[in-house]
Amino acid sequence: MTIVKVATKNIIKIKPIDEGFEKYFGNVLCDVYDVKSEVPAQPINEEVFQGAENRIEKLKQIVKKGEYDYLVGCEDGLINLCGKWFGVQVITIEAQNGKKSTGISPGYPIPEEYVRKIVNSSVDDVVDDLFEDKGGIKYLTKNEVTKVDLVKNATVMALTRILNNDIW
């Protein structure tokens, strides 16, 4: 059995992280911890990646080496690429041997006129206000993609380096 310690109690993130690991490792036990990211409530750019890293570092203060196979930190936020804003999920995984890998979900565009509102609250709050609590990315993609999908994609992307340690 693969033991994964996850630095979130957000149920929307736990299930897809578990599913991402199960896809490659079979039987997985995910233990969850309420660990703070130490970044702003709505992280931007490097803060998104730092939040995932910080969660792992905080988790290492709680769990002992040998009690896990992998540690997982997750954070969602905004990133600016080439002058355009995107909402993303970031997953960082650290193996027991210390090897780390970070994956990122597909990014969905955030209109410039909403960036300031989002920075002052969150993507979820702004989207829920705009679309009357209909589910954020699920609503924007006409039920094609959910936050669960984004977290699972980021998890699988982070696992690429872990799974291919000898060549990647």
Model feature map: region roles:
Residues T2-Y68:
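N-terminal polybasic phosphate/anion-binding patch
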